[in-house]
Amino acid sequence: TQAWLKHFRDAGVRAVGFGWIFIRDIGDAPSELTFETLDQPFTDPLGPEVEEYFTRMDWLRGSTQEDILESRYAVRPGIALEDVSLADADSGMGFTPKVKRLTRTDGPRFTHDIDDAVASIVSGLNPAGLPLREIVSLWAAANGLADEQEEKLASEAAGIIVDLIRHG
């Protein structure tokens, strides 16, 4: 151990990263490679997260965009909606909103920066409620979007939901 520490010190090494590799046979399906940077604190053990991840990916692999939009979802317990504001330096008083994000408070603690529209849509998710497409449609109607804008929003929402599912 001391020899390695001396080698690192002599070589100017300031940090050593550790990682995980999870491999699963998905049969004849096209190979999938996902690389994640876990530079945030996380909660051990990550083993249960790996199995959940593979389950989520199996579902996503078999789902089309239409399937995503016609499905109903639950927000995972422990998800935090964070609104971060910083002191307003221009006015010298109060705060200015800077970022809104969804953050897992368990496992790998993934975080996603989102906007108000995504926050509203995710807030409407309920496994016994409306499918994603209808939640998007309601949001679009409430915000005066034209049909083509609603279709674009639905497509974008499906992609965002896929990313959120991927991260649990």
Language model features: what each stretch is:
Residues T1-N126:
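Rossmann-like AdoMet/SAM-dependent catalytic core
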Residues I23, G107-G168:
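Long, charge-rich, low-complexity alpha-helical segments
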